[in-house]
Amino acid sequence: MAYQTREGLPNGWVAQWDERYKCYFYVNESDPKAKPQWECPVRGLTIPPPPSVDHSAPPSGPPPSYSNSAAPATPAASASSAAPAPAPAASQNRAYGAAPQPYPPQGGYPQQPYYYPNQPNYYPAQPAYAQPVYAQPATSARRGRSGVLSNPMVTGLGGLLVGGLAMHEMDEAFDRPEEVVYVDDNNYNNFDDYGGNDFGNDFF
């Protein structure tokens, strides 16, 4: 029950403490038609608050007017009753329409085959190198110096014919006249059967 006091009030008046607004409202109990009021019937009278009252700051603004129910109307209660409740999220979604559906998945392109044509594995034929052909020495006994030096057999000897001495010996061998050796009698009578030394005179 709210705290009440009659201290300093006229007969029939009572002061009742309002916990919300931290102040007294006054009621004339001698008049059944009287309404509760916030103003003290005695001007300049200040009634101290109850001993166990909370001294926190009261709500801002003056207290509302009292009705016949002898209970002060609170502005917060009136405001909460008048304010409509917020619409649920489902109602808001229906009001604005359903959310757009995502785009259907795009058809993928067929994967292209990755291949390369087979390259011919061949190399152009390399020309075969001819093997050097060494000519056989000529049967003629007399040759010119240029013929001997140009002979691949001679040039192939390399180190055997290197040096001036070897060349000099070769020159003398080729410049030497040919010699014919006769065998005594030789059972041919020195070719007498062919006209009496016809062939022999050519050699002497």
UniProtKB/Swiss-Prot annotation:
The keyword Transmembrane does not apply. It is found in: Cytoplasm; Nucleus. GO terms for cellular component: cytosol; nucleus. CDD domains: WW. Residues 66-100, 108-117 have a biased composition (Low complexity). Residues 7-43 form the WW domain. InterPro entries: WW_dom, WW_dom_sf. Residues 32-117 are annotated as: Disordered. SUPFAM superfamilies: WW domain. Keywords: Cytoplasm, Nucleus. This is WW domain-containing protein C11B10.08. It comes from Schizosaccharomyces pombe (strain 972 / ATCC 24843) (Fission yeast).
